[in-house]
């Protein structure tokens, strides 16, 4: 399991306090749906409307950002705290690679948001955090 340093935890918590959670999450979802179209296969209820401004994307963004907020609140217990969520994702057949792809699109959004201050150190912290989340969400898969 990925472990974040104290500095990385501090950075992740600071970023989460600074950004508009729902907006950045909706943008990351839009980007993952556009760049990796196969990730939309479980979102037929969105009827092909995958823009960050579309209501279905906004609703899913709300769920994702709440889960990320919970992870950030207790970074030492992400895997334990995501056990139920991991099980739900396994039941509906979410490909575990999608979690990694969403993490990548979040990093793109962070780089766009922070432009000059998203340097290698910050990128590494974000990368490790989203890897931690992806591993935790994949933990109940057999």
Swiss-Prot record:
GO terms for molecular function: haptoglobin binding; heme binding; metal ion binding; organic acid binding; oxygen binding; oxygen carrier activity; peroxidase activity. It comes from the Eukaryota. This is Hemoglobin subunit beta. The gene is HBB. It comes from Hemitrygon akajei (Red stingray). The keyword Transport applies. Residues 3-142 form the Globin domain. GO terms for biological process: hydrogen peroxide catabolic process. Keywords: Heme, Iron, Metal-binding, Oxygen transport, Transport. The keyword Oxidoreductase does not apply.
């Amino acid at each position: 399991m990925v472990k974040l340093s104290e500095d990385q935890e501090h950075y992740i918590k600071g970023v989460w306090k600074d950004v508009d959670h729902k907006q950045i999450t909706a943008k990351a979802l839009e980007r993952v749906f556009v760049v990796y179209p196969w990730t939309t296969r479980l979102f037929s209820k969105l009827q092909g409307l995958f823009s960050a401004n579309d209501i279905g994307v906004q609703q899913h963004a709300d769920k994702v950002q709440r889960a990320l907020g919970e992870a950030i609140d207790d970074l030492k217990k992400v895997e334990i705290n995501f056990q139920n969520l991991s099980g739900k994702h396994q039941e509906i057949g979410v490909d575990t690679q999608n979690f990694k792809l969403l993490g990548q699109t979040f990093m793109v959004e962070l780089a766009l948001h922070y432009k000059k201050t998203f340097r290698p150190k910050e990128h590494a912290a974000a990368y490790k955090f989203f890897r931690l989340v992806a591993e935790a969400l994949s933990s109940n898969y057999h």
